[in-house]
Amino acid sequence: MPLNLKNFIKNQALNSKMSDFQDLDHIDGASISAVCANLYNKPRDDLVMFYFRDGANYASVYTQSKIVSENIKWNLSIKSKKIKSLIVNTRNANAFTGPDGYKGLKEIAQEVSIQLSKKQVEDEDYPKRVLANEILFGCTGTIGEKYPTEKIKKHIPELIKKIKYVQNKPIWMKAALGIMTTDLKPKLAMEECKIGNTKVKIYGIAKGSGMIFPNMATTLGYIFTDADLSNDILSKLLKKNIDTTFNAITCDGDTSTNDMVSIFSTGKV
């Protein structure tokens, strides 16, 4: 789908231009895809995949709500040391959907497992099977509606076909736009620094507009680095910084079932 900011950005921010945003480019080991799965019944990307062909170390923090969405339950059940894929859908929060919502995620993960394993065979010298328990989910949107499992499953082959191994600013922008719900504009940022004499990249995208209280409500944030950092270090870094960043935001006094901030390390530097 062509990248048209007007399909995503609200009227209050229609004067936004690509030049207003930082120039995120390539992070080795991370691949991106975004498609329209027709979750909104209009032409906009609403399903986004991040694919780590060699796996990525990771850490996450989640909502402090006692009631959580089905994707948070799924993510909390994952015990894999490395993650192969993160899939984010908009329009539907998969909250208050019960066993059917969780079952839907399992079906999607199994389909992604099959399709990405095929891609490994096609693209890699030493292919490895991608397992369903190496996949994380982010869901955001309306609470209490039936989860659109079949719509999402139907678009998994297209999502994988459109994976871009080399990223650039438009691809990162598609991902940032693709996870938006009521946001006025996309949220993406980058920083580069040195660890010793080695330059590393830290990129991130996020969404969140209303219901931001307390501690991240209705916020999704995804951070990516090519630095070689262990799960333990990533977890410590995330927990150390979350209180002065995502947990410091308040918007309208409501909380959410779906908060999620994750950091992924491809370990390529």
Residue map of PLM features:
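Glycine-rich phosphate/pyrophosphate-binding loop regions near the starts of catalytic domains
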Residues: F50-E107, N133, G138, M211-L234
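Glycine-rich phosphate/diphosphate-binding loops and the adjacent beta-loop-alpha structural elements
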Residues: R91, D228, D259-V269
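Glycine-rich, mobile lid/loop segments that gate access to catalytic sites or pores
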Residues: K106, E111-E122, Y126-F246
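N-terminal amphipathic/basic leader segments beginning at the initiator methionine
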Residues: M1-Y62
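Short, histidine-centered active-site or binding-site loop motifs used for metal coordination
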Residues: T90-N92, G141, A206, G267
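Glycine- and Gly-Pro-enriched alpha-helical subdomains that act as flexible
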Residues: T245-D252, S265-V269
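Short glycine/threonine-rich loop-to-helix capping motif typified by GTGT followed
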Residues: P99-G101, G144-I152, S265-V269
